[in-house]
Every structure is written in C-alpha cells, then in structure tokens.
UniProtKB/Swiss-Prot annotation:
UniProt GO MF annotations: oxidoreductase activity, acting on paired donors, with incorporation or reduction of molecular oxygen
SS bond partners: none
Function statement: Catalyzes oxygen-dependent 5-hydroxyuridine (ho5U) modification at position 34 in tRNAs.
Organism the protein comes from: Prochlorococcus marinus (strain MIT 9215)
Xref: PANTHER family: RHODANESE-LIKE DOMAIN-CONTAINING PROTEIN 7-RELATED, THIOSULFATE SULFURTRANSFERASE/RHODANESE-LIKE DOMAIN-CONTAINING PROTEIN 2
GO biological process terms held by the UniProt record: tRNA modification
Cited HAMAP family: TrhO
Protein name: tRNA uridine(34) hydroxylase
Record-linked PROSITE patterns: RHODANESE_3 (PS50206)
Length: 310
C-alpha cells in the first residue's frame, strides 16, 4: 500500500480582513476538516491571515484556493514542504487581535513596510559593511541556527521586540540615515511586521528577507548558503536542517526549549520532565506531574503501535 505524502503549507498575508468574512472562512475550513484529513494552526485577525496547514495535495489545493478568494487574491506568501507524517494532530483556527502579536496597534503592514529582498540578493546585502542584520525571532529559535554575524535581540516573544528597538537599535547604527537594516525570520511574517514598526519610527533603508529562512534554504545552493545551524519550526518536526528535512532537535515538554542530541545525553535531562535549561524552574510536584504525563504518552505510543501491527 502506497504511503501518504503530506503537503505542508506555511502562509501569511497582511490585508484588511472584515470580521464577518473571518467567521465565514473559519466555518468553511472546519467543514473541509470534517470531510478530509486536514490539520494545522491558522490565525485570523483584522490585519490578515497567518498559519501552517498539513494535508494531502488535493485538500491543500482546495484550502489555498478558498483562502485566496477571501484574501481577494492579494499577495499570499506561501512556503511548501512535504512529510510522510502529519505534523499537527488536528486543525485549530484562532481569531486574535493580530496575526503575529507585537502589541503596537498604530502600525499597518499592509500599507507601510520595508523592501523585500529575495534569496539571491540577500547574501550581497548582508555582506555589505554598511548593513546590520537582525534576527527577529525568539531567543530559543536563534539558539539553534541563524545567519552569520546577525544581531540577536534575545527576546522571549515578538511583543518584546519594540522595546528592544527603543532601547538598543540605535547603538548598532553608525548612521541612522544611511545604514541598511536587514531583518529576517522563519517564514517572513515577523520581519515584515518589524519593518513596518521601524518605518513608523522613522528609520530608513529597511529590508526584509522575502519568504524568510525557509524560502532561502529552498532556493540557495549549499555552497552559497550563509545560514548556520537548523531552523526552528512550530510543529512536531521542531527544526529543519539545511535540506529542509526534519532536523536533529527535540522539544523539552517541560519548558518548550529545543534540545539537541548532545543535550539529551546530559545528566540533567529526563525525557518529558526536565532539561538543563529548566532544571531550576520547576518544583518536585511539577516534575511528578510531568513524569505522569510522560508515562501516559508512552503508553499511548505502545497501544497505537500494537494496533498498527495487528
């Protein structure tokens, strides 16, 4: 029997999205989920759409066509990947104030943002001595892979980025008027919104990597690749390597940090219970709960394996 191949689509678009249409699209997508093997996470807001979906190709095509209609065929940024396994359990659709939370309501990325730089021109830009490169992702994402010589704002979440800009960005600029500011993220959405923030604050020469790290790795040859390490992703794969295959990292289910194969060999590591990042963060009662949860997970895996063999 031929095994299924799942198509994984990461997508986003900034556009004015009316509340009535948000509800309508959500209901139609849930109908598709009921009839098909569709999973993922989608976030809808008045500023647009963001998310990742996973299904077989024919189902993905139906969903993308539907979303394009509601987005009025505006520029829907899409990254494609494939997997032999589902990377989400089910479809979740969330309606929020923002499709990526920054907490600065006065900016409007659909009307005012920086200049897209494609993968081919990105290397030239970041090698320019008059360019600073900023990784707009969270610190735990940066810790497993980033571009050479990029600045890590050490944020725990994207809503901390505006404060970092206010407190630290000018320290990295020799000349606010002439220095190029190049920003990147996983798929393009956070760095695009970050450019809108910087333009609102009066910064010039603002650029962002079109399609983010994922598109860059897909388009740039191994010899020209300036990205070092693996790229964190928000699904069961945890991280992708340079070939966009599942990487070497797992997740610590206690604290959510990515842990490498080497990390899992450390004496502090206990699967599902703790790692060296969080050993001092939780109480003994917390660890007992985590241990019981891990036992339940392991039992379910054994039961599912038996069902599959039978």
């Amino acid at each position: 029997m031929k095994s299924k191949i799942y198509k994984i689509i990461s997508l986003y678009s900034f556009f004015p999205f009316q509340e009535k249409l948000i509800i309508d699209l959500k209901n139609k997508l849930l109908e598709i989920e009921n009839e098909n093997d569709l999973s993922g996470l989608l976030i809808f807001a008045r500023e647009g759409i963001n998310g990742t979906i996973c299904a077989e190709k024919n189902v993905i095509d139906i969903v993308i066509n539907l979303i394009n209609k509601y987005a009025d065929y505006r520029n829907l940024n899409i990254k494609v990947n494939f997997s032999k396994k589902k990377v989400f359990k089910k479809l979740k659709i969330k309606i929020k104030k923002e499709i990526v939370t920054m907490g600065v309501p006065e900016i409007n990325p659909s009307e005012n943002n920086g200049t897209y730089i494609d993968s081919t021109d990105w290397n030239k830009l970041i090698k320019n001595q008059n360019t600073i490169v900023i990784d707009t992702r969270n610190h735990y994402e940066v810790s497993i892979g980033t571009f050479q010589n990029s600045i890590n704002p050490n944020t725990r979440n994207f809503s901390e980025f505006p404060k970092w800009v206010d407190d630290h960005l000018d320290n990295h600029l020799e000349d606010k008027e002439s220095t190029n500011i190049a920003m990147f993220c996983t798929g393009g959405i956070r760095c695009e919104k970050a450019t809108s923030l910087l333009k609102k604050k009066g910064y010039k020469n603002i650029y962002h990597l079109q399609g983010g790290i994922l598109q860059y790795l897909d388009e740039i040859s191994k010899e020209e690749n300036l990205f070092e390490g693996e790229c964190y992703v928000f699904d069961k794969r945890v991280a992708l390597d340079q070939e966009l295959e599942k990487g070497s990292y797992s997740i610590c289910h206690a604290c959510g940090m990515p842990v490498s194969i080497q990390d899992q060999k450390r004496k502090e590591y206990r699967k599902g219970i703790q790692c060296h990042f969080c050993i001092d963060q939780f109480s003994d009662d917390d660890r007992k709960r985590f241990e019981e949860r891990q036992k339940q997970i392991d039992r379910l895996k054994v039961e599912n394996h038996k069902i599959y063999k039978d």
